Amino acid sequence: KVVKGKHHPADFVLWRTAKPGDLQQWDSPWGRGNPGWHIECSAMVRSLLGTEIDIHTGGEDLAQIHHNNETAQSEAANGRTFVHYWLHSAFLTMSGEKVSKSLGNVVYLSDVIEKGFHPLALRYFYLQAHYRTPLSFSWGALAGASEALNRLWKLSRDIAHESKCKSTSSEARNRFLAAIRDDLATPQALGHLWETLRSEDYAPEEKWGLLEDADAHFGLSLTTPPT
């Protein structure tokens, strides 16, 4: 069934006619009303970032409808490419359910800190999975990430004592950067980091150079570990 006023079944709402009691409504050439869901996002992007942006993120559930519609209306209005790179992330789950405000199962950073974890442990936890791969959160999994990060920090301190300067080029650095450039393959990049730091085939200077590169991309305080 095609809604009255549509020219095509795939048409989506750009402007909604106001209903009695609507808290948000404005005058427009099409009558008093409020913008459609997709228009809200296009308007915010244009107002704050401009008509063309490099990276747009969002959940995987927004890819097929919302972001396609957002692109269609933005490019029609502005006459230029809307987004150069889309990053659609898979869901974070907990006990088999998607983490969401509507379900009331959200974990806040303050909760993480109250349980004694360093905030960067949560970042490390996220980096262990590719952004397009579902990730299951538990306090046990976060504890494992925290232990791994603490081991990385210890390795960093040990290497800092041995290293005299940074090596600007190495095969290890190239492997790490290749993983990052491959659709942000952070699990593989972390794997290369661990492999290099544990190996005896690389000089301390090469390891320190890789730690600096990893820190620039991950922000894990690898070269300035907390004491």
Regions from the PLM with identified roles:
Residues 98-100, 105-227:
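Structural preference for alpha-helix termini/caps and helix-kink/transition segments
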Residues 1-158:
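Alpha-helical recognition segments enriched in aromatics with Gly/Pro capping
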